[in-house]
């Protein structure tokens, strides 16, 4: 049995890269017939890829599932079967032509709703961001005011400590001794003067 990896490689190479190269050649040569052919193929392949997303989940257990996928891609690409052109002309084009107006209306409504939803969620996001910024600013301002208040209280305490008067008390012991020393020469001088005056008399 073919594994998932081999099936995926075959689909990528022959279902995507090979048609992409020939689509490039059709655009380069401006061949309208080839251009239309590959446009029909890409529409069918887009539907196949969409369906494959779900069938890989729910039908991967089916016997020969991956072989059937490879065979389907080969059928789409074969110039003999022209599977993509057949599916497009028989099923896809008539269905899209009959439902085109409804599909366009649904797309317009989806576009408008998605735009409104985007604007709504954008406004809500801006409101939440603004509220968070205001709360952060208020908390930061409160913390800053508390910090400044604590600093001002410390400054007042320091100023009071520097301007306090010196404590009153008895003079230091050295002051009395120095005054005694200074007064002793004065007393001896006055005694000598009195002795001199008495001798003269």
From Swiss-Prot:
UniProt keyword annotation of Signal present: no
Keywords: Endoplasmic reticulum, Membrane, Mitochondrion, Phosphoprotein, Transmembrane, Transmembrane helix
One GO biological process term: regulation of intracellular transport
Transmembrane regions: 1-21, 35-55
Residues with the Phosphoserine modification: 152
Topological type in the membrane: Multi-pass membrane protein
Localization per Swiss-Prot or TrEMBL: Membrane; Mitochondrion membrane; Endoplasmic reticulum
Coiled coil: none
Organism: Mus musculus (Mouse)
Cellular component GO terms held in the UniProt record: endoplasmic reticulum; endoplasmic reticulum membrane; endoplasmic reticulum tubular network; membrane; mitochondrial membrane
One Pfam family cited in the UniProt record for this chain: TB2_DP1_HVA22
Protein name: Receptor expression-enhancing protein 1
InterPro entries: TB2_DP1_HVA22
Region feature (Disordered): 158-201
One Gene Ontology molecular-function label: microtubule binding
Subunit field text: Interacts with OLFR992. Interacts with SPAST and ATL1. Interacts (via C-terminus) with microtubules. Interacts with ZFYVE27.
Described purpose of this protein according to its UniProt entry: Required for endoplasmic reticulum (ER) network formation, shaping and remodeling; it links ER tubules to the cytoskeleton. May also enhance the cell surface expression of odorant receptors.
Family to which the UniProt record says this protein belongs: Belongs to the DP1 family.
Biased segments, Low complexity type: 188-201
Biological classification of the source: Eukaryota, Metazoa, Chordata, Craniata, Vertebrata
Main location: membrane
Tissue-specificity statement: Detected in olfactory sensory neurons of the olfactory epithelium, and in total brain.
